[in-house]
A protein has these predicted regions:
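Bacterial N-terminal signal peptides that target proteins for export
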Residues: 1-9
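Hydrophobic helical h-region of N-terminal Sec-dependent signal peptides
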Residues: 10-14
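C-terminal motif of bacterial Sec signal peptides marking the signal peptidase cleavage site
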Residues: 17-20
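A sequence/structural signal for flexible, mid-protein segments enriched
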Residues: 22-270
């Protein structure tokens, strides 16, 4: 399976000067000690699934995140299945036989230099992405001719708390300028047309756009919601941003482990 990936390391560099609790602390951004950053996922699509392990860098350092090799990585589920991951390249660990399923609870265990980090995520029920359309209002900002916005269309199931993350690929390249994470707190049971806002310079007529919709659990949503605030991206850009996002990974690591469903559509921008 093509790695969908979470790609949150770049957002972590501006957070690496704080500890894992919610209290704001002041540290020297140039000399903050590196922290382990773990990105992992299990989906309802066919495996293999990937766990990436890096170390954070100081705020003013180059965006070269040292890979953590030689870690022991295992993912298990609530039915007794367990998969020990293989390191295929520095810091990249992949599963062998694990198959994700909606409703399953998955536990990630990572051991680095005798320190063990654990995380747990339950995969929600699948919600299908029905279609992707475009809103072209014209009169783009800064004199641009186009102001094209992608819209994800789907029906939210009633009576259930649902959380969604959207990942976009433009002409095969993942769009990483924004974080798209939403809850159904105000839209429960409704037909949703979700605007996926981005700077108008990123979409042009004729581009091939793929939109993947993830159904994520509440802890993963909280992580990306807070990360978008802290990094000034996405729909949750507020002045009262937390110093660092609350992660579902224990023992002081940064990052997130997500078990989620995937529903995707590929369309040509018009």
């Amino acid at each position: 399976m093509k790695r969908t990936g979470l790609s949150i390391v770049s957002g972590i560099i501006m957070l690496s000067a704080t500890n894992s609790c919610q209290k704001v602390v002041t540290l020297d951004l140039q000399t903050a000690p590196p922290q382990v950053v773990i990105e992992g996922e299990v989906t309802d699509a066919s495996g293999p699934y990937t766990v990436t392990i890096n170390r954070s860098v100081a705020f003013y350092a180059d965006n070269n995140f040292p890979a953590v090799d030689g870690a022991a990585v295992k993912i298990s589920d609530d039915q007794g299945a367990s998969d020990s991951l293989t390191e295929t390249s520095p810091g990249i660990y992949v599963t062998h036989m694990l198959q994700g399923r909606a409703g399953g609870t998955y536990t990630l265990k990572v051991t680095v230099n005798d320190t063990t980090y654990t995380a747990r995520s339950t995969m929600p029920a699948r919600v299908n992405l029905d279609s992707v359309t475009f809103d072209n209002t014209g009169g783009g900002r800064f004199g641009r001719k186009n102001n094209i916005r992608a819209q994800a269309n789907y029906r939210d199931p009633a009576g259930v708390k649902n959380y969604y993350q959207f990942v976009l690929y433009i002409n095969g390249t993942r769009f990483t300028k924004d974080i798209y994470a939403f809850s159904d707190r105000l839209t429960d049971g409704k037909n949703i047309t979700q605007n996926l806002r981005m700077d108008s310079s990123y979409l042009s007529p004729g581009d091939l756009l793929r939109v993947d919709m993830y159904c994520i659990d509440g802890n993963v949503y909280n992580y990306f919601n807070q990360l978008s605030q802290a990094t000034g991206t996405g729909a949750f850009n507020t002045a009262a941003a937390p110093a660092n996002p609350s992660t579902n990974i224990g023992n002081g690591a940064y990052g997130v482990f997500s078990a989620h469903t995937v529903s995707g559509r590929t369309v040509t921008v018009n």
